[in-house]
From Swiss-Prot:
Protein name, per record: Large ribosomal subunit protein uL14
Keyword field: Ribonucleoprotein, Ribosomal protein, RNA-binding, rRNA-binding
Record gene name: rplN
InterPro entries found in the cross-reference section: Ribosomal_uL14 (IPR000218), Ribosomal_uL14_bac-type (IPR005745), Ribosomal_uL14_CS (IPR019972), Ribosomal_uL14_sf (IPR036853)
Recorded GO MF terms: large ribosomal subunit rRNA binding; structural constituent of ribosome
One BP term from GO: translation
Organism: Jannaschia sp. (strain CCS1)
SMART domains: Ribosomal_L14
């Protein structure tokens, strides 16, 4: 469950290390984002010579949350930390690699590129 001011890890090699959610997209009064939702983030920490710089405002998709995600079959999955993948203007990942596992729910939201790049899909 991601809301404004939430800090997230970045799970790709776009150059950002930490980002902060500044808006949850999908309605004017929407408060929370879960796995597969697109948010607007500000880059708080970045590596030198990366594709994004500190202070950049970008779109990102949430790939892992500490709040559990309920599934149709009754199971739930949760992670230790919140993580996101930075997106470009075409809603494709900016990086060429994804670090760590991602959840199956991204497939239903048409983030196939992230699914194919991820080392593990849970």
């Amino acid at each position: 469950m991601i809301q404004m001011q939430t800090n997230l890890d970045v799970a790709d090699n776009s150059g950002a290390r930490r980002v902060q959610c500044i808006k949850v997209l999908g309605g004017s009064k929407r408060k929370y984002a879960s796995v597969g939702d697109v948010i607007v983030v500000s880059v708080k920490e970045a590596i030198p010579r990366g594709r994004v710089k500190k202070g950049d405002v970008r779109k990102a998709v949430v790939v892992r949350t500490a709040k559990e995600v309920r599934r149709e079959d009754g199971t739930a999955i949760r992670f230790d930390r919140n993580a996101a993948v930075i997106l470009n203007n075409n809603n494709e990942p900016m990086g060429t690699r994804i670090f760590g596992p991602v959840v199956r729910e991204l497939r239903a939201k048409n983030f196939m590129k992230i699914i194919s790049l991820a080392p593990e899909v849970l």
